A protein has these predicted regions:
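A structural "hinge/loop" feature
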Residues: 13-26, 43, 124, 339-357
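Short helices/loops that flank or line small-molecule/ion binding pockets
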Residues: 83-94, 135-136, 222-231, 244-258
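A bilobed periplasmic-binding-protein/Venus flytrap-type ligand-binding module shared by bacterial periplasmic
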Residues: 60-63, 115-140, 144, 153, ...
Length: 364
C-alpha cells in the first residue's frame, strides 16, 4: 500500500491476528542472498557479530535501533551441553546467566530461580502404527506411568501433571480434566484384553528421545521405559541429537518407521491454544499422527471464533483428545531453573526457556 504500510489478507477469519503477528520475525527476503546464511539481519536492538558453530555467538548493541537503548553493550552466547558445567560457569563468574539448568544443579538460593516455563512434556504416540492404533494400549501407557515417582527425583518437585498440551494460563485450557491416575493393574488388564483380541502387544516399540531436550531427559526415558515394560510393553530407547529426532517428530514421516513414542516438549506462552492445536492434532498438522473428524471440526471452529465460544470450543477439543483419543503419554507442565550471577539484574520468567531477551538485562 505504501512504503510503511502492508495489507494482510487471510483465507479464513483470524480474530487474534495481533497476537499472531507478535511472534513473527521480520527479515528482508534479500538477506540470505546478500549476506549469507550466517549473517542474519533483523529489526532488533542488537546486530550479529560472530558465529563459531557449536561454540559461541556474539552480538553488539545496535546504535540505530528504533526503540529504547538497552544497557548491555556486548553479548556472548557460549554453548555447553552439561547442566552442571553451565551452573558452575555462573558460580565462578565465567558466565552471567545459565538458562535451563537441571534441578540437581540448582543448589544456590542466592543465584538460582525456579519458575513455570510454559513447557509441556509428553510422549507422542504414533497412532498410525500398529499396535498403537488400539486405544486400549494408549490408555494402558498412561495408567502405567507413576508421575509421583518422577516428581522430585528426575523432574523438579514443582512440575504439574498435565491433561493437555497447553498450560493453565492459555485461553482454551480445560480446567475440568483430571490427570491419568497411576494404576498398573488396570494397565496390565488393558494390555491383556488387547492381546486376547489378537493385537500384537509384543511388537517392539521404539522410544525416540532427544538428548538434552530438558534436564535429565535420558534418565526420564529410562524410568518411563521401565514403567511401561512392567505393564507388558516391549520397548527400546533411541536417544538422538536434534537433527535425527526431528525426522521422527515432524512430517514427512518415514513409511517404514514402525511404532514409536517420541519424546517431546511444547512451549506456548502466546495466550491462545491455536498456537498448539493444529500443529499437534489436526489431520494435516506438521507433528500430528491423529486424524479425528470431531477434533478437526473443533480446531477449525475455535480458530475462527471469539470470546467465550472460542474458549469453550477449545476446551471441548481438549476433552475429546484427553478422554476419547489419547494421542499422548501425558507427563508434566514443566518448571525451569536458571542461574543468574548476582552482578546481573534479571529475573527469569515463563519465556526464558525459549528466549532470553538481552535488552531486558541490567547490572546491579
Amino acid at each position: 500500500i505504501g512504503s510503511h504500510t502492508v495489507a494482510i489478507k487471510t483465507k479464513t477469519p483470524q480474530p487474534i491476528m495481533p497476537a499472531m503477528m507478535g511472534i513473527m520475525s521480520i527479515t528482508s527476503p534479500n538477506t540470505q542472498e546478500a549476506k549469507g546464511e550466517r549473517n542474519p539481519q533483523g529489526t532488533g536492538p542488537y546486530v550479529f557479530g560472530k558465529w563459531t558453530p557449536g561454540q559461541s555467538v556474539t552480538l553488539k548493541r545496535f546504535s540505530g535501533y528504533w526503540g529504547s537503548t538497552p544497557v548491555v553493550e556486548d553479548v556472548m552466547y557460549v554453548f555447553r551441553k552439561e547442566s552442571a558445567v553451565r551452573a558452575a560457569m555462573v558460580k565462578t563468574g565465567e558466565a552471567d546467566i545459565a538458562p535451563n539448568i537441571a534441578v540437581q544443579d540448582a543448589t544456590d538460593p542466592k543465584m538460582d530461580f525456579s519458575y513455570f516455563n510454559s513447557e509441556t512434556a509428553r510422549l507422542r504416540i504414533d497412532m498410525s502404527q500398529k499396535p498403537l492404533d488400539d486405544i486400549r494400549l494408549r490408555k494402558a501407557m498412561n495408567l502405567a506411568i507413576d508421575l509421583d515417582a518422577l516428581r522430585g527425583t528426575i523432574f523438579a518437585a514443582g512440575v504439574v501433571p498435565q491433561t493437555q498440551i497447553v498450560v493453565p494460563s492459555i485461553n482454551g485450557h480445560n480446567p475440568r480434566l483430571k490427570p491419568w491416575p497411576y494404576n498398573l493393574a488396570e494397565a496390565k488388564k488393558l494390555v491383556a484384553a488387547a492381546k486376547a483380541d489378537g493385537v500384537d502387544v509384543g511388537k517392539e516399540i521404539v522410544i525416540i528421545g532427544r538428548l538434552g531436550i530438558y534436564p535429565n531427559s535420558t534418565e526420564a526415558m529410562e524410568a518411563m521405559h521401565a514403567m511401561l515394560s512392567e505393564a507388558g510393553f516391549n520397548l527400546k530407547i533411541k536417544m538422538m541429537e536434534t537433527a535425527g529426532w526431528l525426522n521422527f517428530l515432524s512430517r514427512p514421516y518415514a513409511e517404514d518407521r514402525g511404532p514409536t513414542l517420541v519424546q517431546g516438549q511444547h512451549d506456548n506462552n502466546n495466550g491462545d491454544a491455536v498456537f498448539s492445536m493444529y500443529n499437534k492434532y489436526a489431520c494435516e498438522g506438521a507433528q500430528s499422527t491423529t486424524c479425528d473428524s470431531q477434533v478437526e471440526a473443533g480446531i477449525k471452529a475455535a480458530t475462527a471464533a471469539t470470546g467465550d465460544k472460542r474458549r469453550d470450543t477449545w476446551q471441548e477439543v481438549q476433552r475429546r483428545l484427553h478422554q476419547d483419543i489419547v494421542p499422548d503419554v501425558q507427563m508434566f507442565h514443566m518448571v525451569g531453573f536458571s542461574r543468574v550471577n548476582p552482578r546481573i539484574d534479571f529475573t527469569p520468567s515463563i519465556a526464558t526457556n525459549s528466549q532470553l531477551q538481552v535488552s531486558q538485562v541490567k547490572f546491579n
